[in-house]
């Protein structure tokens, strides 16, 4: 509907479809709009550039107002058939499986990460971005995985450290997306680089050292 908000059914790298606005796909879209605006200006297509700019401003403002919960950006789940927002306060609400919901996703700012690398600037409120990275460190970083349960792939174990794919400080969904309890280096590096852009050097290096310690050439290959 060209309101600047990524909606509907969104297939993603978690091998599932998210239903409803969420930061992972939302910020990718914001970055794409900013990039498209710059390309349009380079081609002297002022009409398309203006359209991209309008969609970006609308979408970015909406995400900061509706997805940012004071600590990080969350997912507003919609009905897979009607795409109406679900009332999560209703104990009888039927939530589709494999969603994120109020989870704190490790790569919720992946679009912002790429935007910084491409010189596109901030896609959302600067303070919200920094606060979100702090929350990822607060809620997703696990210093010792000895007592961590993971029914999926074990890329971290024992007394090793890392950033969880997602955490639910505000209450976990009954059936989250499949890989929520895992740790994956690519997603961790994404968060760490975001922290570096926000001058959060201590937090970034903590994450990077955890990766390098796990992939030290003896326990796992470093490549």
Region annotations inferred by a language model:
Residues 58-60, 124, 200-206:
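Beta-rich accessory regions
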Residues 22-72, 82, 123:
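Active-site neighborhood of glycoside hydrolase catalytic domains
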Residues 28-46, 107, 111-124, 189-200:
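Well-ordered alpha-helical scaffold segments within catalytic/enzyme domains
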Residues 177, 184-186, 190-207:
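A contiguous, well-structured "functional interface" segment within a domain
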């Amino acid at each position: 509907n060209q309101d600047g908000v990524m909606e509907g059914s969104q297939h993603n790298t978690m091998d599932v479809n998210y239903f409803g606005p969420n930061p992972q796909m939302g910020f990718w879209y914001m970055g794409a709009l900013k990039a498209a605006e710059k390309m349009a200006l380079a081609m002297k297509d002022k009409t398309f550039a203006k359209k991209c700019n309008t969609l970006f401003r609308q979408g970015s403002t909406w995400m900061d107002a509706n997805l940012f919960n004071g600590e990080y950006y969350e997912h507003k789940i919609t009905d897979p058939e009607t795409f109406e927002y679900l009332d999560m306060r209703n104990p009888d609400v039927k939530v589709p499986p494999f969603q994120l919901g109020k989870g704190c996703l490790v790569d919720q700012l992946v679009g912002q990460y790429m935007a910084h690398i491409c010189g596109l600037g901030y896609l959302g409120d600067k303070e919200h971005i920094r606060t979100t990275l702090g929350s990822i460190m607060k809620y997703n970083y696990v210093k010792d995985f000895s007592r961590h349960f993971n029914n999926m792939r074990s890329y971290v174990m024992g007394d090793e450290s890392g950033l969880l794919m997602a955490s639910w400080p505000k209450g976990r969904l009954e059936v989250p997306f499949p890989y929520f309890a895992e740790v994956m280096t690519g997603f961790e590096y994404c968060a760490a680089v975001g922290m570096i852009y926000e001058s959060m050097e201590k937090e970034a290096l903590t994450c990077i050292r955890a990766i390098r310690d796990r992939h030290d050439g003896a326990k796992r290959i470093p490549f």
